[in-house]
Amino acid sequence: MSSGLTDTIIASIVTVLACGLGGLPFVFVKDFPEKWARAGWAAAGGLMLAASVFSLIIPGVADAGINPVALGILLGALMMAATAVWLGGQEVEFSGLSVDNSRRALLVLITLTIHSFPEGIAIGVAFGSGEIGLGLVMMIAIAIHNIPEGVAVSLPLRAQGVSGWKCVGWAIFSSMPQLIAAVPAYLAVMAFRPLLPYAFGFAAGAMIFLVLSEMIPESRHTERQRLSSAAAGMAGFLAMMLLQNIFVI
């Protein structure tokens, strides 16, 4: 095994485990009142919207123009819509949750897992370029970026009654595609490089659809909750935006 491939695998493992750090605080959260649960949905939605804009759409457009990204967004949203319709007709059960909560939890996991594929490609392409410095910068940036994404996975799961350690496990699981995608991207860097803008758009479309169709409606039931949810959503959005300003993916 070449040293470059070994570096790619190690970097991917680091970024995957970093996502689990975002779920770790929820191990120590024993009670999750409804008002905090709804604020959690909103905050996670804000994190996802900011990640969609600043780590997916803007870099994709800067790299290849708007058309590939727009096509990816459309396909990602259509895929999530089809998935939501399909899950709505199934008696799904996830981690002991009710049918409705299981459906939402699965949609969150599917969306964040999809989001991890282009990040894995980015890691593989960076190390495959032969610039070890670029690969290390990409690893650090994505690892730091993955911590709030682990929060985004864990918040809605913990709010619905999933245990803290399971939240950590599912956060790590949602980032596993980074390892899966990084290796072939490293081995075939020239073939995977043109796919990044489409993959970025696809992941952004899936996340934006989830936020608009599930997370925002779930966070708003009363007038008072609408205000607190808006504040939580803005806090999540601003936190991720500031993070992206420091570590651009």
Task: State each model region's role.
Residues 1-249:
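Intrinsically disordered, metal-sensing/regulatory segments
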